[in-house]
Swiss-Prot record:
Protein's gene: leuS
Amino acids binding ATP: 731
Chain span(s) of sequence motif 'HIGH' region: 66-77
Organism of origin: Streptomyces griseus subsp. griseus (strain JCM 4626 / CBS 651.72 / NBRC 13350 / KCC S-0626 / ISP 5235)
GO molecular function: aminoacyl-tRNA deacylase activity; ATP binding; leucine-tRNA ligase activity
GO cellular component assignments: cytosol
Protein name as it appears in the record: Leucine--tRNA ligase
EC number: 6.1.1.4
Keywords: Aminoacyl-tRNA synthetase, ATP-binding, Cytoplasm, Ligase, Nucleotide-binding, Protein biosynthesis
PANTHER family: LEUCINE--TRNA LIGASE, MITOCHONDRIAL (PTHR43740:SF2), LEUCYL-TRNA SYNTHETASE (PTHR43740)
Top EC class, one word: ligase
């Protein structure tokens, strides 16, 4: 028989069992729903409620909302949800108005791929998955305000996702004001002449297409032809953040190639400095802040112009402008748009054969090399390959400080995604440039004095000398000399010279690239954009939102051979001609016109960029969010100067994806005056992972963990020895344990306790089903201390508890309260267990005052049993909004403490004393102790060191 179905239970009909837990939990979940127990009142609007509750200090607690996958939840998924629920319950009991709810992030590739696999429409499968997950989550007893729940696929929700896109599209970043402004204000500047157009023509003289192109250079959301990450195996393009370090798609592990396609982008780079600087005011783990700082990648240097006779100039960004005199060639990324403008019709006379790649003309060489480079990922291109590849463009540029002509190459180790996509090559002092120069027999010049004994002739070197701790040499022209200067001073001098001569200036560069925002998928938010017959993009008016997804016969993305870098994407929406081609009156005075809809969709990150705002005012169909409601829950306040959610819990894997994107959207909305909070999440907490053992047979295939037997330290499945490693939990690994199984066997409260007791919340830990019973027994003992298992009657008495019990109780109250506030739930459970064990050991019926406070202590952790016991103790109201117990300091302090007395560093006595004893009193007691007197043996005392109440150290004469 199992632990939950023993003969003993038959003899004790009112014992706390799995069956009783199921009954209790179902009843109280129904009660909470019926009573709206977890409904948090807004200060105004349709969700306003109890003014007394709304007047309390507020707490907005959020989880990263789940994808509704077809597999449902395993026990690892609810770890964070249970933790935030425990924390939220404690905050309610300590006088806060707590907003805690949960929605679903239901658009995007995961849901679409599941739908494709099962042959059902994404909406049908996604909604079915959500219903299943709602049942699973409700079973856990999570205290969510369900009035505020939604899914990102709800048209009422993505109407506002589209609306936000239009705000971003219709905005530009004013670098002088350091904020976003409406694009109409920029147009006004062009119209009145306070801002000149690039070619000096008046705004009215520009064609509609020219105006659109010019504004596109400023808009915070814009479409452009640019190199993107194209995954033929997925049939879509990917953001940089969705590509793994080895150049493959994060989802599906397909090869990713560079392809030049027209795509929508978000100008997140305009906010790079603010995204970086505002991290300092956030209460986030330092590891996450570091990841964002590195991803944004701020570096100081200079922009330098290298003139090209036939095409203006090539601009480079360098952090080592001090080495300009050593630049002997240049390299452009193969995709650089300057390449076409500089290549001559024929190779210049005397071109080195190794530079041409064996091609008859520069154009042929460039075309062939570009095709070769396109088949590589960025990671492959930047790998330290033994053989450096590239080709001469046939063009020369002029080094602006030396006046020398330097050849211009293209090579795949230079990327368009950093700096300007062009570099000045200083081979004597850069490892990659050194290797390239050796491969192509290019000249090198030493301009930094080596600190070793290699000399100053790079032709004799085995590698580059790249130290910063050295002086400049060979770095002078008729106007400036850097010789003898250190790197820092040389940088400052040459930067000043470049600016004076109009060939460069000091600048800051960022690793961060603009956010690729379009996907060739069906299951995403449609763009509220249409194109006229001239190809000019027009925003839909707000009255036409939401633009809903149309029905299509085939919603699968068209995928290709994963290795086919030449394949071109095809969007599912483009197959619905009736939806794509429309006649609309956009209200711009042009009347009804024919338009073509944008057929890309938004990425799965779009809906999660602003969902915290929708939780605040979920039924508002007039505006994004009521300003007074947003100010109440998320506005700036003392200690939170940029506002935001009070606590946001989720995985660390979203450091440079969701978290960065959401910060960007918040800043745009803040700049435009729509919200008061400049940051979405003030405090971030990353929970650890619940791991599980994975068992694999000799072929490396996972076998069901539940069917594995252990014999003499080895593991067997169906008689075959298998290996065991600790890893993730999941359906594909055949080691998933569902919360449904544990709830059926022990109850939801036991599952909650076990997950919180496994270890510190931010540390990963292995799941062990066999250990769950420990928390089940805790609840059984706690129940038994309040309820008679034979009769079901409450056994408490109205008497005062003894001194020992009061001390145990108040120490537990003090410790549990601190642990709850600090999210140290494992140690809180340990303290509750210690108190319950004390009460069990003491025997006899509990004092009512002790029993009630014991129930209140366990209530945030195990709310169902707490509600049941609270009701049985005679209370008609819910335990949820009761005050959390407050410890009496008099009982928290120990009655006596042990003081160690040392003589010459050796312990000679231990004294039981009051913790309030003074140094003088303690010294007198120690010197009078018989053991101390005997140990001194009549010797005099040179010194007594007292550290009351724990230590006395005696130094004999």
């Amino acid at each position: 028989m199992s632990e939950t179905n023993s003969a003993a239970e038959t003899a004790a009909p009112h014992r706390y069992t799995a069956a009783m837990a199921a009954d209790i939990e179902a009843r109280w979940q129904d009660f909470w729903d019926a009573e709206g127990t977890y409904e948090a009142p807004n200060p105004t609007g349709d969700l306003a409620g109890d003014p007394e509750l709304a007047a309390r200090p507020k707490k907005f607690i959020m989880d990263m909302f789940p994808y509704p996958s077809g597999a449902g939840l395993h026990v690892g998924h609810p770890l964070g949800y249970i933790a935030t629920d425990v924390y939220a319950r404690h905050q309610r009991m300590t006088g806060h108005n707590v907003l805690h709810t949960l929605g679903f992030d239901a658009f995007g590739l995961p849901a679409e791929q599941y739908a494709v696999q099962t042959g059902t429409h994404p909406r049908v499968s996604t909604e079915a998955n959500m219903e299943n997950m709602k049942v699973q989550l409700r079973r856990l007893g999570l205290g969510h305000d369900n009035r505020r729940s939604f899914a990102t696929i709800d048209s009422e929700y993505y109407k506002w996702t589209q609306w936000i896109f239009l705000q971003i599209f219709n905005s530009w970043y004013d670098s002088e004001a350091d904020r976003a402004r409406p694009i109409a204000e920029l147009v006004e500047q062009f119209e009145n002449g306070t801002r000149a157009t690039p070619d000096g023509r008046e705004w009215g003289a520009l064609s509609a297409a020219e105006r659109a192109d010019l504004l596109s250079e400023y808009r915070l959301a814009y479409a452009s032809d640019a190199p993107v990450n194209w995954s033929p195996g997925l049939g879509t393009v990917l953001a940089n953040e969705e590509v793994t370090a080895d150049g493959r798609s994060e989802r599906g592990n397909f090869p990713v190639f560079k392809a030049k396609l027209r795509q929508w982008n978000m100008r997140i780079t305009a906010y790079a400095d603010r995204l970086l600087n505002d991290l300092d005011g956030l209460d986030w783990p330092e590891a996450i802040k570091l990841q964002q700082r590195n991803w944004i990648g701020r570096s100081e240097g200079a922009r330098v112009e290298f003139p090209v006779d036939t095409a203006g100039g090539i601009t480079v960004f360098t952090t080592r402008q001090d080495t300009l005199f050593g630049a002997t060639y240049m390299v452009l990324a193969p995709e650089h748009d300057m390449v076409e403008r500089i290549i001559p019709a024929a190779w210049p006379e005397g071109t080195h054969p190794v530079w041409t790649g064996g091609h008859a003309s520069p154009a042929e060489a460039v075309t062939a090399y570009r095709k070769q480079a396109a088949a590589k990922s960025d990671v492959e291109r930047q790998a330290e390959a033994k053989d450096k590849t590239g080709v001469f463009t046939g063009a020369y540029a002029t080094n602006p400080v030396s006046g020398e002509k330097v050849p211009v190459f293209i090579a795949d180790y230079v990327l368009m995604g950093y700096g300007t996509g062009a570099i000045m090559a200083v081979p004597a002092h850069d490892a990659r440039d050194f290797a390239f120069a050796r491969a192509f027999e290019l000249p090198m010049r030493c301009v930094v004095q080596p600190s070793d004994d290699r000399g100053t002739d790079p032709a004799t070197w085995d590698d580059a000398f790249s130290s910063y701790d050295a002086k400049l040499v060979n770095s002078a022209n008729d106007e400036i000399s850097l010789d003898g200067l250190g790197v820092v001073e040389a940088k400052a001098r040459i930067t000043e010279w470049l600016k004076e001569h109009g060939v460069g200036e000091g600048t800051v560069n960022f690793r961060l690239r603009d956010w690729l925002f379009s996907r060739q998928r069906y299951w995403g938010e449609p763009f509220p954009i249409v194109y006229d017959e001239d190809g000019i993009a027009h925003p839909l008016p707000e009255s036409m939102l939401p633009l809903e997804l149309p029905e299509v016969e085939d919603y699968s993305p068209r995928t290709f051979d994963p290795e086919d870098a030449t394949a071109q994407p095809e969007t599912p929406l483009s197959r619905n001609a009736d939806w794509v081609n429309v006649t609309l009156d956009l209200g711009d005075g042009a009347g009804p016109r024919k338009y073509r809809r944008e057929t890309n969709t938004m990425p799965n990150w779009a809906g999660s960029c602003w969902y915290e705002l929708r939780y605040l005012d979920p039924n508002n169909d007039r505006q994004l969010v009521d300003p007074s409601i947003e100010q109440y829950w998320m506005g700036p306040r003392e200690g939170q100067p940029t506002g935001g959610v009070d606590l946001y819990v989720g995985g660390a894997e979203h450091a440079v994806l969701h978290l960065l994107y959401a910060r960007f959207w918040s800043k745009v909305l803040h700049d435009l005056g729509h919200i008061s909070s400049a940051e979405p999440f003030h405090k971030l907490y990353n929970q650890g992972m619940i791991q599980a053992f994975v068992y694999r047979d000799s072929r490396g295939i996972a076998v069901p963990a539940a069917e594995v037997e252990e014999r003499d330290g080895a593991f067997y499945h169906a008689g075959e020895k298998v290996s065991r490693v600790l890893g993730k939990m999941g359906k594909s690994l055949k080691n998933a344990v569902t919360p449904d199984e544990i709830c059926a066997e022990y109850g939801a409260d036991t599952l909650r306790l076990y997950e919180m007791a496994m270890g510190p919340l931010d540390v990963s830990r292995p799941w062990d089903t066999r250990a769950v019973v420990g928390q089940y027994r805790l609840l059984q003992r706690l129940w038994r201390n309040v309820v008679d298992e034979a009769t079901g009657e409450v056994t408490v008495v109205d008497t005062e508890p003894d001194e020992d019990t009061l001390r145990a109780l108040h120490k537990a109250i003090d410790g549990v309260g601190q642990d709850m506030a600090g999210m140290r739930f494992n140690t809180a459970i340990a303290k509750v267990t210690e108190l319950n064990n004390h009460l069990t050991k003491a025997g006899g019926p509990l004092s009512r005052s002790v029993a009630e406070r014991l129930v209140l202590l366990i209530a945030p952790l195990a709310p169902h049993i707490a509600e049941e016991l609270w009701r049985r103790l005679g209370h008609a109201d819910s335990v949820v909004h009761q005050d959390f117990p407050v410890a009496d300091p008099a009982y928290v302090v120990d009655e006596t403490v042990t003081c160690v007395v040392q003589i010459k560093g050796k312990v000679r006595a231990r004294l039981e004393i009051s913790p309030a004893i003074t140094d003088e009193e303690l010294e007198a007691l120690a010197l009078a102790d018989e053991a101390v007197v005997a140990a001194l043996g009549g010797a005099g005392i040179r010194k007594v060191i007292v550290r009351a109440p724990k230590l006395v150290n005696i130094v004999p004469a």
